[in-house]
C-alpha cells in the first residue's frame, strides 16, 4: 500500500507519468512474485523508503527521515537512500540562509540525518524487545551463496582457472575475493552517482 501510494506521487512531483510509474514500479512481476509472493520484508522496507522520499520531496524531512530510518532497521540496504536525502535537506537549510553557507548546511543536514536515523533504529530496537545483538548478524547474508548474485557468478567462472594456478584455492576463497571487489566497485559507483545527482531534489530522487 505504501508503494502504491508513494510511487505515482513521486512521479507526479518529478513531472513524470504516474500511470507509467505505477505499472513499472508497482504492478510488475518482481513485486508480485518476489516481494509479495515470497513474503520478503523488503516489501515493507521499500514502501517505507518510498514514503520517506515522497515526504522529503514535500519538505517534511522529520517524518521522511524517520520512515527511512525505520526502513534501515528492517533492512540495512535502505541506508543507501540517506545520502541523497542529505542533498535535499542541505538545500532546504541553505535556503533559510538566502542560499548561502552550503558547507555548513551540508554538515548540519548530515548530522540531522545521522542522528535521526540512529534514534529511529534505537526506538525500533527497544519497542521490538530486541537487544543490539542483531547488529552482529547483519553480515549473516554472506553465508548464503546465491548463484544469481554477480560475485557468485564471477567466482564460478574464475575458480576453475584459479585451480590451475594453485590446487589449494577453493571456491569460497575466490568468492570472498570477488565479493570484496564487487563491494568496492559498488561503493565507488554509489559515491559517483551521489555526487553526480546533487544539484536538485529531482536529481537526488532519480
Model-flagged regions — what are they?
Residues 7-29, 202-205:
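Transmembrane-helix signature of polytopic, membrane-embedded enzymes
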Residues 44-60, 188-195:
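Specific aromatic-rich, kink-prone transmembrane helix
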Residues 81-115:
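Perimembrane helix-loop-helix junctions
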Residues 4, 13, 137-206:
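Aromatic/glycine/proline-enriched transmembrane-helix motif characteristic
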Residues 115-140, 159:
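Transmembrane-lumen/periplasm boundary regions of multi-pass, lipid-linked membrane glycan transferases
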Residues 4-8, 12, 33, 49-58, ...:
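Hydrophobic transmembrane alpha-helices
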Residues 23-46:
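Aromatic- and kink-enriched transmembrane "portal" helix at the membrane-lumen/periplasm boundary
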Residues 32-35, 51-55, 61-85:
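Membrane-interface alpha helices of multi-pass inner-membrane proteins
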Amino acid at each position: 500500500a505504501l508503494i502504491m501510494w508513494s510511487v505515482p506521487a513521486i512521479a507526479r512531483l518529478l513531472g513524470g507519468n504516474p500511470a507509467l510509474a505505477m505499472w513499472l514500479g508497482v504492478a510488475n512481476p518482481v513485486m508480485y512474485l518476489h516481494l509479495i509472493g515470497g513474503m520478503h520484508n523488503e516489501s515493507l522496507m521499500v514502501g517505507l523508503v518510498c514514503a520517506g522520499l515522497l515526504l522529503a520531496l514535500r519538505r517534511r524531512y522529520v517524518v521522511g527521515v524517520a520512515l527511512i530510518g525505520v526502513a534501515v532497521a528492517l533492512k540495512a540496504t535502505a541506508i543507501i537512500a540517506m545520502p541523497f536525502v542529505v542533498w535535499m535537506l542541505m538545500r532546504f537549510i541553505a535556503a533559510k540562509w538566502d542560499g548561502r553557507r552550503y558547507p555548513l548546511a551540508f554538515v548540519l543536514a548530515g548530522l540531522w540525518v545521522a542522528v535521526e536515523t540512529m534514534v529511529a533504529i534505537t526506538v525500533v530496537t527497544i519497542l521490538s524487545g530486541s537487544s543490539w545483538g542483531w547488529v552482529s548478524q547483519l553480515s549473516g547474508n554472506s553465508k548464503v551463496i546465491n548463484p544469481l548474485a554477480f560475485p557468485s557468478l564471477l567466482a564460478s567462472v574464475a575458480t576453475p582457472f584459479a585451480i590451475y594456478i594453485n590446487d589449494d584455492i577453493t571456491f569460497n576463497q575466490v568468492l570472498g575475493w570477488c565479493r570484496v571487489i564487487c563491494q568496492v566497485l559498488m561503493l565507488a559507483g554509489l559515491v559517483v552517482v551521489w555526487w553526480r545527482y546533487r544539484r536538485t531534489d529531482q536529481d537526488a530522487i532519480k
